[in-house]
Amino acid sequence: MNFLPSTVLLLSFVVAIISGSFSSISEEWKAVCECNLSKLNNHAKTGNCKTTALWKVTSDTNCTASEYLKITVFPANDDPLNRVEQCTMTPCDQTEKTPADCNVAFSAAKLAEIAKEEKSKMII
């Protein structure tokens, strides 16, 4: 039993050292889908939706801002960017946005939240 206080003290010291080595992380998150839709002949949708998201992650050593944009036009048109996700992932200290694959700029969980927001607003 004499080893118990020494072991607890040693473990407390190790935990304190390990926890001090992690940096603090903060994030800002917002996803919005704005739609202007109506039904055409009670069947097909007509109008458009604009989906945007911003995910800013800051740690002790760096900061990254990821942006998402998708414009959806109903009925579909010939615009090659219709219904195409466009993303950027840029260090916060830079003004020129860097294009990025959306799967790199956003986590799978964040992309799922964007899709959920979009789906909820496209119902008419």
Swiss-Prot record:
InterPro entries cross-referenced by the UniProt entry: DUF1505
Positions annotated as glycosylated: N36, N62
GO terms for cellular component: extracellular region
Membrane-spanning residues: none
Primary localization: secreted
Sorted UniProt keywords: Glycoprotein, Secreted, Signal
Protein family (similarity comment): Belongs to the UPF0375 family.
Descriptive protein name: UPF0375 protein Y45F10C.4
Source organism (scientific name): Caenorhabditis elegans
